[in-house]
Amino acid sequence: MKVAVYPGTFDPITNGHLDIIRRAVSIFDRVVVGVAADNYKKTLFSLEERVELVRTVTRDIPGVTVKSFSGLLVDFARREEAVAIVRGLRAVSDFEYEFQMSIMNKKLASDLETVFLMTATEYSFLSSSIIRQAASLGGCIHGLVPPEVERVLLKRYGFL
C-alpha cells in the first residue's frame, strides 16, 4: 500500500487544499492529511478545531485520514509508513521554498520522496491567509472554501 502525507497548517482548509487531496488520493492508496501543530505561527483556529474542520470536509473522500502532528515532518511520515510527501504549488514563487524543504527532507530521510502537484488554475491565487483576511473584513469567500468552513469563519468573525 502506497501511503503519502499531505502536511499543512490548514488555518483554514481551502478548496485549493481539497483539490490537492483529491488528486493525491488518485495517485496513492492512502493519503494522511497531517495538520501541523505549528508552534511558530499564530493560528486563528486551535489545532483541535483545524483537525475537526479537515475531517469534516474530507469525510467523503475514500482513502483519506486526518491526524495532527508536531515535530519533524519526516518523523511523522515515517510513523505513517509513507513513501512520499505531497506538496501543492500555486505559482513559481512557491517552488523555491518547497524545493529547499524537499532537499532538507531528503537529507533527513533519503527514502522519502516529495511529490509536487500544481494547484488547479482556479485556486492558484488562494491561500489560507487570503481567506482569513477577506473573511475578517466581511468579503465573500463563497466557493473558495467548503461551506462548512465558510460558516465557521463567518461565525468566528461575527458575521453570522
Curated annotation (Swiss-Prot):
Domain of life: Bacteria
Chief location: cytoplasm
GO biological process entries: coenzyme A biosynthetic process
Gene3D superfamilies: HUPs
Catalytic activity: (R)-4'-phosphopantetheine + ATP + H(+) = 3'-dephospho-CoA + diphosphate
Localization terms from the record: Cytoplasm
Single GO cellular component term: cytoplasm
Keywords for the protein's UniProt record, in alphabetical order: ATP-binding, Coenzyme A biosynthesis, Cytoplasm, Magnesium, Nucleotide-binding, Nucleotidyltransferase, Transferase
GO MF annotation list: ATP binding; pantetheine-phosphate adenylyltransferase activity
Positions annotated to bind ATP: T9, F10, H17, G88, L89, R90, E98, Y123, S124, F125, L126, S127, S128, S129
Role noted for this protein: Reversibly transfers an adenylyl group from ATP to 4'-phosphopantetheine, yielding dephospho-CoA (dPCoA) and pyrophosphate.
Sequence similarity: Belongs to the bacterial CoaD family.
Subunit comment: Homohexamer.
Protein name: Phosphopantetheine adenylyltransferase
Source organism phylogeny: Bacteria, Bacillati, Bacillota, Clostridia, Moorellales
Gene name of this polypeptide: coaD
